């Protein structure tokens, strides 16, 4: 199994990994198109991690890739909910199906008692999802174990009950597409 990925940093030679990639719209659109057409993906799910908002990258993805659905990933801060609203409205205007909303950094669980501590507030993502009749698929905690596995390149070893709803929604989307 495993995760396959491609990114702009793989396309540019002789650069330090901390150097920014500064591209304008037409170049971004071309790179997105190239990722889609020139890479032999052979995957059941293709995740496209995009910058927040409604700029060139989401526009290029929505226009050039036949999408079965998108998952809007957000965090609980008030300002972020405005960005999510824009992304959802953009997808709706472009007839891109939305599978649901996933809230990242929802809370941290106390290691001693398990109590959820909402560092960035609570309920904003759920409210935004409800306004658009979308399911809130998962609320991902800030989890040091998950962070350690990601850093070690072993994300597939992670198990978290909060992930099940999102996985179920993806499976339903795949079945509808077949």
Predicted regions and their residues:
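Single conserved hydrophobic/aromatic residue that forms the stacking wall/gate
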Residues: 1-12
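Short, structured coil segments at secondary-structure junctions
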Residues: 6-7, 65-66, 94, 132-133
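Residue-level signature of catalytic and energy-coupling elements of molecular machines
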Residues: 7-8, 32, 49-50, 84, ...
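Switch II (G3) loop of P-loop NTPases
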Residues: 13-26, 34-60
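Conserved nucleotide-binding/hydrolysis micro-motifs of P-loop NTPases
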Residues: 13-15, 52-54, 76-80, 105-109, ...
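Helical mechanochemical/support elements of P-loop NTPase systems and associated helical scaffolds
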Residues: 24-31, 53-57, 79-83, 94, ...
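Inter-motif core of Ras-like GTPase G domains
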Residues: 38-40, 58-78
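C-terminal lobe/tail of nucleotide-utilizing enzymes
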Residues: 88-178
């Amino acid at each position: 199994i495993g995760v396959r990925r491609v990114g702009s940093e793989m396309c540019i030679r002789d650069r330090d990994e901390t150097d920014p990639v500064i591209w304008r719209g037409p170049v971004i659109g071309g790179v997105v198109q190239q990722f889609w057409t020139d890479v032999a993906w052979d995957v059941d799910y293709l995740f496209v991690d995009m910058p927040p908002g409604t700029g060139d990258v989401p526009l290029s993805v929505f226009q050039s890739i036949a999408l079965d659905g998108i998952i809007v990933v957000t965090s609980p801060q008030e300002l972020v909910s405005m960005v999510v609203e824009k992304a959802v409205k953009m997808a709706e205007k472009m007839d891109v199906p939305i599978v649901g909303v996933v809230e990242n950094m929802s809370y941290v669980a106390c290691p001693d008692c398990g109590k959820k501590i909402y560092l960035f507030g609570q309920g904003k993502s759920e409210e935004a999802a409800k306004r658009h009749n979308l399911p809130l698929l998962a609320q991902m905690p800030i989890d040091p174990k998950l962070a350690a596995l990601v850093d070690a390149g072993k994300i597939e070893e992670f198990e978290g009950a909060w992930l099940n709803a999102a996985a179920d929604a993806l499976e339903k989307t795949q079945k509808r597409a077949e």
